[in-house]
Structure formats: structure tokens, C-alpha cells
Amino acid sequence: MEAAALLSPTATSRSPLPLLSTAPAAHRLHVLLPLSGRRRRLCLRSSPRPRGSLGCAGDCVVRSMGSSRERGVLVKTSSSSASVESATQEVGAASSGEWSGDAIRRRFLDFYAARGHKILPSSSLVPDDPTVFLTIAGMLQFKPIFLGKEPRRVPCATTSQKCIRTNDIENVGRTSRHQTFFEMLGNFSFGDYFKKEAITWAWELTTKEFGLPPERLWISVFQDDDEAFSIWHNEVGVPKERIKRLGEDDNFWTSGATGPCGPCSEIYYDFYPERGSSDADLGDDSRFIEFYNLVFMQYNKKDDGSLEPLKQKNIDTGMGLERMARILQKVPNNYETDLIFPIIEKAASMALVSYTTADDAMKTNLKIIGDHMRAVVYLISDGVIPSNIGRGYVVRRLIRRVVRTGRLIGIRGDGHGNSEGAFLPSLAEVAISLSTEIDPDVESRRKSILGELQREELRFVQTLERGEKLLDELLDEALSSAGNNGGKPCLSGKDVFLLYDTYGFPVEITAEISGERGVIVDMKGFDMEMENQRKQSQAAHNVVKLSVGNETEIVKSIPDTEFLGYDSLSATAVVKGLLVNGNSVNVVSEGSDVEIFLDRTPFYAESGGQVGDNGFLYVYGEEDAKQKAVIEINDVQKSLGNIFVHKGTIKQGSVEVGKEIDAAVDAKLRQGAKAHHTATHLLQSALKSIIGSETSQAGSLVAFDRLRFDFNFHRPLSEEELMKIESLVNQWVSSATHLETKVMDLQDAKNAGAIAMFGEKYGEQVRVVEVPGVSMELCGGTHVSNTAEIRGFKIISEQGIASGVRRIEAVAGDAFVEYVCARDNYMRCLCSSLKVKAEDVNGRVETILEELRTTRNEVSSLRSKIAVLKAASLANKATTIDNTRVVVENMGDVDADGLKSAAEYLVDTLEDPAAVILGSSPGDGKVSLVAAFSPGVVKMGIQAGKFVGGIAKLCGGGGGGKPNFAQAGGRKPENLPGALEKARDEIVAAISSKSS
């Protein structure tokens, strides 16, 4: 179930949401929603019951679909009841061979298209919704329509939606249904049809089109939904004993404390009808699989909790494609469907194993690889680049799980003879080949996807190698600590989790290596760390809050705003509404901040990266035409789709609902936005031309005085590349090319090669902005009419903002002229100060820098010599502890280099064994520490690196080094005397204990 899974407390032990319902009870997904003044807990079903593959016992033989749609490979499995073959042999009149995943998807979409539904493409995995982390259901792209925030584009629609869910990632591969990536088939009605059609069509689709035996289908309905029960029984003909009435927690969907809500109904497939119906429990996952859910949005929940019928009743449904494929293809789990299994087969061949004969552990690992590769390919295709934050971390984590799992099962090399190469691209090739039907854009982004995966894998392999080194150090430390306190050496759960999460070390490998060294692993502590991360991931990824607030209710009564700003910067309009602090008012007086709604406007509202216009609204007298009010507009935003909200301050007089006003946009600022917006289009084309067509936009800002463009690329741009990009843009600017704008069908625009803007939603008709021969983009922003109006283009900076994402900031138009003039003025001042011509500035600066470097080196050398002279006097102050010479001193304001020289001098001057610990505070708020131990001290087992690092913590810092020499620093100079006293006590104690 889609909306229910997202929005309501309707799924506890029996989730209506396909593919998202197999976690143990402890792993439920909770969404807190306010209902009738109390908090309600939503659980996406996480059944506590154990599951078999399909509920068969002993050694079962099942027919499994593979990369060839009709391959019929025999697979041995083990479960709990009769054979899978017998459990599925009655499915459909057609053989399982004709039911490929693509065929199921096409049949579903064509079925509803024949019944008046518009087939719409899947939306991005990156939702246009700040309340949702990733797209986790098919209804997300229609949420604003269901909540009344946007007008319906079509009366009814059908989709196959790409979805991602990662909060139960540890169960992937271990159950028959858990996946991170899945497809949700859905049909949606926006007031066009309702319960009867939804139910009868769902039944016709499953029994006639897909051929599922009616006697194997069970139905659940909301306990009070007599209408649905009647339709299922009296019109469809389902026996009463196979229709279960369930409560509000299972079968009622609500969007929040108030707003649209309604009952839902689910269709289950029964693998074992011979068990009878007297005590059948739809929550028995070994027997039933819920594959289709229908949500009937028929009520509006009021503030007092009462329900009133909606004027527009909606339908939201969801069918898990992988679940239906599992049923029709007669395989024991979702992974062995032809949607995933070709990736698994490729991974098995690269690991030199056969999936058919592999043990359960190997199969689990191969399933993890197959699932995760689908997820990362689609995420990267949708613009999510591996990083350490947000969605990028999801991709990085999935990639690292594939890499470490692949290495665990023996995959080495790229599959093409290169043992040092990356193997992810070879697996991704298979995933991309399976993507054509659901997302044709994936193929066009092949090069970018493969490159990103290769770079990330090779980087992670280096991280793994660093992890191996860290593990060795942690084991040394555990053994050392145990030796000092007489305990048993143990690797903490926190350290095990660090190795697992940051360095990708499988826990079993950590445990194995630790065992070889005689160190036990704190698995309880590790499990606690994993649970904490799971809770954080769950909270970040799956909480969806929907509510229709007071302001939204007010704005819903306002008509859409007619935008005039493409052709005019001024217009007469009528005030349709006023908001002050979110409350509706009829009149607003001087000095107040206000949000104004007009029936039409020349002001551009912020969207597509372009900021909203600034300007003024004027109110004139009806009789004397004198100016009565002035409102300064400093921002314009969109609300509920196409309602423009003019935000500003009443500078003079008052404004009233229903009155006529004159609107005037600040022409200078608008021209700046136009120049920067067109320059942004040219910049993107230049980037594709210079560094490669696979680069794509990852975000943008078009302001009045600058532009910012984020793009996907794996390295910094060179100075030469930046110069070429800048030169190319300026070449296009000087060509004085006229821009062309036209409105086209979305698909026609894409076919013509138009580039879609990052994160934007598009309707059936789109506006296309073209610089002929240079750029063509889908864009609703404002632009210059001729590239010459841009005047010039200058890149200000280029930098990385995340892993795989770069940012260019630049200026154009008047801002370009101002920038160049300012830089010219700086150069004049510099020439005057250096007393050289502009062309000689670089040479003069290099000379000054070289002189400065020489002077600094001389100063550093003198300081070191002074420190050594001071150290000479310290040698006489050395104390002797059990034949070991010890010096612990504060050397005042000596810098780090001088301190190092002094320590080296002392340890060389004193007879072995000798230990020297020196500290200083150069006066810049910092502390320097150094420890130098002679070979004799090191042989005692006293290491300089560990010793000085511990002392440095007292000074608010840290450090380390080799056993014989180490340096550290800190930021608390006031603690230095106490730290050195502690150092003296500890080195004396350490030497004394070793000598005894």
C-alpha cells in the first residue's frame, strides 16, 4: 500500500506496502502522526514470524527464471512445507516463461491505459518534497494533488515508479522480500472513478490478465467498509470466508490530524490453499503474500476528528512488480526473478561459483550484490553522487557493501582480465541493460555511471587497506592494554563498528583476524552501535509528515496567478488576498510586512534556481488618481503550484483585498537575473564541450548579481580548462545570437535534445529555451533576447562542495563589468605599491616571495640553533632513574621546529638509555610537545608515539609518531606545566616498572 505506507497508522503486523514489510518486530518503521490530539504510531509491517523461501519443506526443486527469460534452471532450496513447484503450478493460464518483468510492467500499464489512464513516467528517486529523503512509493509525485495543493494534470494516471528504501538494509538478501530498490506499479484517480471501478479492475487485472487462480486470492477490507466488502463479495464474487475485515491500524489511511483519508483494501496470494480458510491469518508470511493494495480516499478528517465525505474522491494503488514477478515466474524469492537474477549470475561468474550449487551464505552475498547494484545504478543516474552526507552517503554505503561483499566471496579484477581493476562497472553494465523499460535515461548516462562506480570502488579499496592497518593497530593496543591490566584482550564494539562503517570491514573478517591474534570481539557493543545507526537512518529516511496548515487552507481559496513577466515588467492587477503572519486579513497598513496575492503579475516567482523579482506595488485613488499606497516587494515565491506570493513591506498608506494595484518590477535587477540565467545555460554547454558530455547539473542559483552552478565531476578543473570554458562562453556571448523560446510537448522536447533542469517537475507542455547551435533546455526562467545582452562572462571560483560535485561561481551582465572594473582598480593599486608595470607584477611578486622564503628559513635556522644552545644547558639537569637519563622541561616560546632540534640534540648527547620530553608555548595560543627516546628506552617497551599522544590530550590536542620520536600539539597553553609534571611522573613510573 502506497499512501498508507507513507502517511497513516494503517500497517502494523500486516503491511499493505509491497516489498517493505519483512523486518523483525524490533525493526519496524515508525512514523508519528498527530491524530485527535494524540500521537499515533505507524508501523510499516515488520512481521515477527520467521519465513521460508515459499513455505516448502526439505529439499525442494523450483524452476527459476534467469537472464534468459525462459531458462528454467533447477535450484535446490530448503523451507518448511510442500514444494514451491506445487505451490505455484496453478498460476495463470500462461507459462511462467512469458511473464518477464518487462512484460508484467507493460501489461499493467497497458491495462489501465486502455481504461483511460495516462501513462506517466517514473519520477526521480530524489523527490521534489522536503519531507521525504528518497522516493519510497509511487504516490509521491501525486501527493500535492491528493492534498489539494496542485490542480490535477490528468483525471487518472498509471505509473511504474522507481523506489528506494534502506532502513532495513541488513535484511537484504536474508529474506525473500527485502530490497533497497524496487518498482511500484500503480493506478491513480483524481476524482474520476472510485471504489467499484478500482476493485473490479484490480480483480480483472490479476485474474484475467495475469491469470492468477481466483481461489488463491484473499482480500482484506477495513472493518467498517461495508461498501468494499459488498463489491468484493456480491459483484466480484469472492467468497465471504476469503474476505477479512481488519481494523483501523491495518486498513485505514490518513494524511495527518486533518485532511484526506479513507479505508483501503489489499489482495493476497495464497501459496497453500490446502491449509483451509477456517483459521487463516493473512499475517502468516509463509503462506500469504500481499501484492496489490487499493486506497480509497473518500473522507476529510476535521479538527474534531469527525469525518465528512470529500467532494473529490481519489484512488491510490500500489502493486510490487518484483512480488508479482515472483508469483508469475514461480521462483522462491524476489531476487531470482529476471529483474535481478542476471546481475546475480554475473556476480557468481566473477566469483567463479555457481549460484545453483552455492550454499546459503554464498547465495545471501550474491543477492546483496544483485539488489544493491540496481539501487546504485539508478541513484547515480538520478544525480546522487557518493559522498559522506545525505543521499550521497546512502549511495556510498551501498557501493561499499557491494565492494566488501564481492571481495568476501572472492571477486577480484574487472572481469576483463585486469586483476587490479574495479568489478562494479561490469556488474553495472548488466543492471543498465535491464533498465531500458523503466528508465531509458539510464542508458544515456552509462559512461557517467560506470566512471563514478569505478572511481568510488578504487578509492574504497584504498580505504580498506587503511582499515587493515588500523585493525592491526587496534589489536596491538588491545593486547597491550590487556597485558598491563591482566585482563583478556578485547576489541570494543565501537572499534568494530568503526571498521565496519567507515572502512568497510565485514564483521566476520574482523572477528577472524582478531581471533588469530587472540583478541575477542565485543559483538554486543557492535550490535548496539548498529541499532543506533539503524534508528538514525530510519528517522532520516522514512518519516513523512503531511498536514494541511492554516496558511495552506487560506491559499487554497486563491486562484492561480497569471504570469505576464515574459513580455512585460509592469501591469495592473487586483489584490485577491493578504496574509500577515500567516493569517488572512482584508486590510494592511503602513509599516507591516505582508504577503500579497494578485490575479496577475509581471513579477517572476523563485523557481528553477532563479530568484524572485524585486519591485513595487502602487495603489492609486479611484477619483483623483493620486498615489495612496506603496508596497516594496523583496521576494516572490510560489505556493500550491501556480499561486504567486508577493512578500514585502507597506512603505506608505494601506492595501485592501479587492483593490486594483499597479505592479512594477525593478528592471535593472531583472536584467541582471536574465543575463545570469542565459549565461548559466551557456556555461553548462561549455562544460559539456570542454570536460565531457557526461557531466550534468547538480544544482544552481541565478541571482541578480551572480550565478552559481553545481555539476557532477570527479576532479578539480585545471586553470587551462577554466580558461577554455570562460573563453567559449564569451565567444557565444559576442556572437550576438538571438534566443528562441517555444512551448512543446515534454516528450517532443526531450526527443529534440532539450536538457531538463535538476530537481524540476514538468507538465505535459514545457517551455524550451534555445540558443541555436549552442544550448537547448527546458526552462521557465527569464532570459535575454540576444546573447550580446550578457555583455561578458567571468568565472570567479571553482571548488568542490561534496564528493563528485563541483561548483563554479561566475558573473555576467552589469556585474561582469563591475567585477572587471574592480579588478582593474586592484591592479592599478598593486602596480603603484610595487612600483612596476602591470605586466611585471607576477615577476615582482615571485621575487618578494622568494626573499620571504629565504628569510623565514634563516629565522627558523637561528631559532633551532638557539633551542639547541638552551638544550645544552638542560643536559646537565638530567635526572637518572634506574640508569636511564631523563629530561622533562618547558622550553618557553621555542617553536615546533626548535623543539624538535633540541630534543634530537639531547637524546644524542645523553648516554643510552635516555628519555627526553620537551614542551613549549610559542605565544600563538598553541602548545608544542615532543618526545625522543633512545634505543634502550624503546627496548623497554616504552613508545614515544603513544606516550606523547596521551600527554597532549591534557593540553586539548593530540599527536603521535614512531616509537623513538613523536610530536604533538594542543590549544591550551595554560595546561602545559601540569601536563609536563604528569609526563615526568609517568615516564619515571614506566622506567621504574620495566627495570624492576
Curated annotation (Swiss-Prot):
Broad class of where this protein is predominantly found: plastid
UniProt subcellular location: Plastid, Chloroplast; Mitochondrion
GO cellular component: chloroplast; cytosol; mitochondrion
Function: Catalyzes the attachment of alanine to tRNA(Ala) in a two-step reaction: alanine is first activated by ATP to form Ala-AMP and then transferred to the acceptor end of tRNA(Ala). Also edits incorrectly charged tRNA(Ala) via its editing domain.
Keyword terms, alphabetized: Aminoacyl-tRNA synthetase, ATP-binding, Chloroplast, Ligase, Metal-binding, Mitochondrion, Nucleotide-binding, Plastid, Protein biosynthesis, RNA-binding, Transit peptide, tRNA-binding, Zinc
Protein name: Alanine--tRNA ligase, chloroplastic/mitochondrial
Coiled-coil boundaries: none
NCBIfam families linked to this entry: alaS (TIGR00344)
Native species: Oryza sativa subsp. japonica
